[in-house]
Amino acid sequence: MCIRDRVLGILYELDGEPCPVDPRHVLRRVVSRLADDGLYPVVALELEFYLLDSALADAGEAHPPVLPDTGRPAERTQVYSLADLDGVSSFLAEMESVCAAQRVPLGGASSEYAAGQFEINLEHVGDPIAAADHAILLQRAVKGIARKHGVAATFMAKPYPDSAGNGLHTHVSILDDSGRNIFDDGSEQGSDRLRQAIAGTLALLPESMAIFAPNANSYRRLIPGNYAPLAPNWGYNHRDVSLRIPVSGHKNRRLEHRVAG
């Protein structure tokens, strides 16, 4: 019996210094600087993906699959369809089991805005590095389990020219030393520090696009009518902006970064 495991490593130079191109070190420095100011991010990620016909995917062609549990082609565009979730119920059940074994905190799953498109949400965690690790492990699990169930999976930003793209949505709130959410001041609009965080994030957005949209396909996603951002903007519960402030209770006030894909 072949036993396999995985290790998420951190890169160091031969002299023991952190490797400058390791993104975990970059994120660790950011988290450390926030902690020096008594601030602690709480992060949750949402990942969108398509399930595809595996034979055509192997040939380099994207085409919706036959849903493995119902035998019905994934043809409809019905956001939040329960029937589409029924069609992949065994896939989702195995996802839950595999992620539990890896301590990846799944939150929920939904069918999305195109045929064969789904989203899986991860729970909020107080360690941004762990949140990033969870996303990587989730991607690997989705692709591997999809193959086991006779379909392929892709997180490509825009696999179909005329359908919605896939994004990575990052939800962030920040707590102070007392555990209070600094984005909440009891008002419906949120605190001044929330608006300051929005302003700073938008100011850095042009330079950040090399990471958030790293290839030409990423920009094919950024078109009108697909719940993807078109400008460095923000809004309350608006799904076409770069930074969305979701409807939530005051203590859960957060910023959703919707650009990456």
How would you label these PLM feature ranges?
Residues 4-261:
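Glycine-rich, acidic/polar active-site loops that bind/position phosphate-bearing ligands
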